Amino acid sequence: SSADGKYTYQTFMDATDLEAATKIYAMGWERCAMVGGKPSGWESRFTNAQYFYNAITSGTLGGSGQGLAGATGSQLAVVNACKSTPSPGQNWCAAWVTNVFKAAGVGTFGGNACDMVKAWCHSNNPADLKVGMIVGDASHPGTGSPGLLYGHVGIYVGDGKVMSNEGAITTKSLDEFIAFYGKGSGVYWGWIGGVELK
């Protein structure tokens, strides 16, 4: 508790690293229960703290990532394929991503959303986000069992927007996408297959 002096305003202000500051905030203000030596919901809390810290310090909070005007070659081919590739159906977000990259001539990359995210998405720093990167989570509670088991994946199309298959093909702001899908394992991005688009 804050009474023992560990989780006070002053200890928060004196914190020199993000992990300590996040823990102090969770324990001192949100009054979270401790689970395994960390505040409850730690993975989601710390992932979101990293996202906002990176966004604030890089000056890209709100409408983050590379703009579409800066995209070239295969990046634009992926954006065009996003706009023309139909939905394979509800709960088939990763299949849509696979179909988009195949249609764009980049390659064929299979797996569930959680597989793609775990293999290729390792950043949540908005400064790293480029047009054509996949964006997703390995697990989230918002869509019930499918989301918890398989996560969700979409494609960053520039200007702070992510397209994905949610039954219909949707376009959301990165902030909206993170607000919904970031409540579990957190949202990360990277190049599918490790193939940097140029």
Range-by-range predicted roles:
Residues T57-G111, K118-A119, K130, S145-H152:
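N-terminal capping segments
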Residues S1-D4, W29-A33, Y53-T60, C82-P86, ...:
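Sec/Tat-exported extracytoplasmic proteins
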Residues Y25, P88, W92, M116, ...:
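Acidic, low-complexity intrinsically disordered regions
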Residues V35, N54, G62-G73, V79, ...:
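Aromatic- and glycine-rich peptidoglycan recognition patches
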